[in-house]
Amino acid sequence: MVDIKISGRKVSISEALHTHVDQKIGDALKVFDITPMSCDVVLRVDKNPSNPDRKTAEVTVFVRNNVVRVTASSDDMYVAIDEAAEKVSRQLRKYKTKVVERR
């Protein structure tokens, strides 16, 4: 299992958020038989009141010869993390099929 580095910008990372990120992003990384080199998760809260989706989760996964980067925003941090996990899963599926087709 790859170590997931979690950092927060303008937000403190609680134990519940840390557990949720480990569970959701970790499960998305385990689904496909891909061993990423590293994974970085940045959770950010924007202070702009006119932006309804102020909470953002950015996930960067470094795999061999490729980088998968997704961003998801929502008004709830947990929803943003869930959306980012779905996007990572979709991108890794595309990467996996591309690698298999080129063999």
Predicted regions and their residues:
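N-terminal, polar/charged subdomain of small-to-medium soluble alpha/beta proteins
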Residues: M1-R103
